[in-house]
Curated annotation (Swiss-Prot):
Gene3D superfamilies given in the database record: CD59
One example GO MF annotation: toxin activity
UniProt keyword annotation of Secreted present: yes
Extent of the signal sequence: 1-21
Keywords noted in UniProt: Disulfide bond, Secreted, Signal, Toxin
Localization, UniProt: Secreted
Any one cellular-component term (Gene Ontology): extracellular region
Lineage of source species: Eukaryota, Metazoa, Chordata, Craniata, Vertebrata
Name this protein carries in UniProt: Toxin C13S1C1
Taxonomic source organism: Dendroaspis angusticeps (Eastern green mamba)
Pfam annotation, one family: Toxin_cobra-type
Amino acid sequence: MKTLLLTLLVVTIVCLDLAHTRICYSHKLLQAKTTKTCEENSCYKRSLPKIPLIIIGRGCGCPLTLPFLRIKCCTSDKCN
């Protein structure tokens, strides 16, 4: 019985992913959608300020913004 409980505990920890990783889309313009498991707790989406529907890139973390780029950061899985 103790072995069964220990096994269930290990499976629960693995499934819950207590390492606090984030799943983010990680691809550039005109590439197929890919995902990446990131250690950072945020994802970003980079686009042009004048044309926000054209997404230049996506990835892990939250990079610094530049005047000619729009960067949206978020903190849930596949939010970018």
